[in-house]
Each structure stands twice: as C-alpha cells, then as structure tokens.
Amino acid sequence: MHPSTPISSLFSFTSPAVKRLLGWKQGDEEEKWAEKAVDSLVKKLKKKKGAMDELERALSCPGQPSKCVTIPRSLDGRLQVSHRKGLPHVIYCRVWRWPDLQSHHELKPLECCEFPFGSKQKEVCINPYHYRRVETPVLPPVLVPRHSEYNPQLSLLAKFRSASLHSEPLMPHNATYPDSFQQSLGPAPPSSPGHVFPQSPCPTSYPQSPGSPSESDSPYQHSDFRPVCYEEPLHWCSVAYYELNNRVGETFQASSRSVLIDGFTDPSNNRNRFCLGLLSNVNRNSTIENTRRHIGKGVHLYYVGGEVYAECVSDSSIFVQSRNCNYQHGFHPATVCKIPSGCSLKVFNNQLFAQLLAQLLAQSVHHGFEVVYELTKMCTIRMSFVKGWGAEYHRQDVTSTPCWIEIHLHGPLQWLDKVLTQMGSPHNPISSVS
C-alpha cells in the first residue's frame, strides 16, 4: 500500500449498478452526495423485481413512455442522504435532470404517474421523467384607459371605501394552516365582509378586437387603451427586518428564486441567505433576544412559476399577513395566517394579482386611480417569527411582535407603478388620510 493512501479508500467501493446510474447524472457538483443518493436508491430498488431495469430504461430513453419507479414513503416524507434531508422525487430529479432544482414547488407530476409525491400514498415515484418543471406563465398586458369616461355605477371606489371603513377590524382575524384552509374553496363573493375586490371573470378580451361579434356593444376602441406589460425585475423581492417598530440592518435584495431567512450567522455573505443573527441593535430587550434564539432555520421563500411560497423550517411557527393569499382563500384582507413548523403556504400568486388589476382597470376607468393604488398593499407581505399578532393574541399589530420581516414584491410593484403613471393624477389626492 502506498503510504499516502487513506485508510478509508481501502473500504470504499462503488457497485457497478451505482456507476451505471451515475452515468446519466446531470451537472458536476457534489459528486459524493449524488453517489450516496444513488447508492441508497439502488439498495431499495434491488428489493423490487424489475425496478432497476425500469429506471435505467427511463434514463436511457427520456422521450419514451416509462413506468413508475417507487420507493416506500418515510414517516415525514423525506429522505436523508449524508446528513441532508430532502424529498425523494426532488433529490433524484436534481441528480438526473435539473441540478439547480431547489424545491418540490418547482415540480408537477405527469398524468401518467400513478404514485406522485403529492398523492401521499405508501409508495413514492422517483422516476425523474414522471415530473415536469413548473414554467413561469406569461402575464398578458393590462389595458389602461386613456380617457376619463367616468360612470359612477361602474366605480369601485365607493364600495372599496365603504368596505374598508366598516369591515376593518380593530385587530386582524387569525387563521391557522392547514386547519382554517380546508373549507376554503377560493375567493369569497364580493358581498362578503371585508371583500373589496371585484369577483367577475377576468376581462382578458377587452377591448373587443375589430370584427368581433360584440364590437358594436363595446363603448371602447383599441385606441382608448394603452397596454402595460409585466416585466420580471433583477431582484424579485426585498426583505427588511424589524424588531418591534425599529428597522434593523440593511434591506436584503433577493436575486435567487430560493431564499432562506434564518436566525444564524453566515459571514460568507451568501446571496441565497439573509442571516438575522448577524444584525445588532443597541435597543434590543430580553424578549427580543429570547425570540431571536428561537428563529432557528427560519423561513424558506420560493419564487416559482409566478408564485411565492413560504415554508416554515423553524421549530417555531411563523405568522403571515398576505392580502393576496387572504383574497384567494376568502379571508378578510388583514387576516394573519399561522404556518406551523414543516408546513408551506402559497403567499402570492402573480396571475391572481394580474386578474384583479385588469378587473379594476376595466370597471373603474378614471376614478379607479385610488382603487388601483390600493393594490400596492397586496404587494407587501408581513411575517413574524415565533410570536403572532391579531385577535387571538395580546399583540394587536405586527409592530408589537419582537421579530418580523416585511417583504416587498418588486415585479407587481413596478407593474403597478407603470399603470398608475399611465393613468395620470388621481381624482382625489393620495395622502395619509385618503
């Protein structure tokens, strides 16, 4: 034996089956991790007749139909590979198809898959060609009226103000995921308390194109509208950290579609992490200190296919106030949703936002400036760690919670800004008392 040969190498052995499967591996990072992941899989598949052959067939002929390749589902649904836990279908899709895959939110099963991860059966399909990657939908441009053709009966401003004045609670309502969401079948009708947005179908076809049957019924022509397109910004969101009502540290600009906000310290300045443990505050009290110790792994934000997800990876719950999420589930706009450890919730949907914006523009014309401006509130998400706020807590407002963050969604905000610029000045000046 050569004196420099490590002892561990004498006992390391990669089976021919593992070597064969690694031949289809995508990317060149984390070789050892991929090898251990494949080795773990081979040991499971060897117990099932024909499973190895089916996997090799799927990998070697990606365009051809293939059967499910399954492994038993663990208690928490995750698989541990070399001190790292992950969902099995995500792990093997990362190994054999998409090395940059971050989350299960980026995957959708094909119709041919009988054991997709989301079905929660005893077996889980890990065939990477039984899943597809979620694509970001292209949002149609919204059409901004050029002229002031105000019809009081079409205006939503009065309804908006009436609902805001009479239905805004002294303290926000509370909801817990997933319990409060199980009866939710989508947005509530417009007459329900707190709902100030229209609920008519999205008018994606306005104004009518020339020659269409209903052209004579439409009061508008193409020249009456100016299209404003959605553009994806370089940084999809920014995150500001607060302790009570004090901003602490610099704002974090998120360029990666997967961002971890935790309570640890990471001096490497990783662009995918916002480490709250690094931030100092001379006014910090014992309650804040104790809360910061419980943030732990914090929250994982994913921006996938035009949707934003928040996954609680802390041992303690997180609390989220998202008007977009509340509208989608039929809650009051100010409702605070509790996300327990290990759960994830969709907190923003670009397509829903686009529909609301298009509806407001179509129905309220000139006097809808204030109503459209109100949509800026939907582009901000507030989230507290460990301690909640609202009607069920002694803290009435997010600024009473020890540790919280405010997330600004740049794409929707910039889109709104362009729309409002095209609309011109508001009928009533926007102010703190408007």
Swiss-Prot record:
SUPFAM superfamilies: SMAD MH1 domain, SMAD/FHA domain. Residues 16-140 form the MH1 domain. It comes from the Eukaryota. Residues 236-434 form the MH2 domain. SMART domains: DWA, DWB. One of its GO terms (cellular component) is heteromeric SMAD protein complex. One of its GO terms (biological process) is transforming growth factor beta receptor signaling pathway. It is found in: Cytoplasm; Nucleus. GO terms for molecular function: DNA-binding transcription factor activity, RNA polymerase II-specific; I-SMAD binding; metal ion binding; RNA polymerase II cis-regulatory region sequence-specific DNA binding. Phosphorylated on serine by BMP (bone morphogenetic proteins) type 1 receptor kinase. Phosphorylated by activin type I receptor-like kinase-2 (ALK-2). Residues 202-221 have a biased composition (Polar residues). InterPro entries: Dwarfin, MAD_homology1_Dwarfin-type, MAD_homology_MH1, SMAD-like_dom_sf, SMAD_dom_Dwarfin-type, SMAD_FHA_dom_sf, SMAD_MH1_sf. Gene3D superfamilies: 2.60.200.10, SMAD MH1 domain. Belongs to the dwarfin/SMAD family. Interaction with the co-SMAD SMAD4. Interacts with PEBP2-alpha subunit. Interacts with RANBP3L. Transcriptional modulator activated by BMP (bone morphogenetic proteins) type 1 receptor kinase. SMAD9 is a receptor-regulated SMAD (R-SMAD). Has been shown to be activated by activin type I receptor-like kinase-2 (ALK-2) which stimulates heteromerization between SMAD9 and SMAD4. ALK-2 binds TGF-beta, activin and BMP. This is Mothers against decapentaplegic homolog 9.
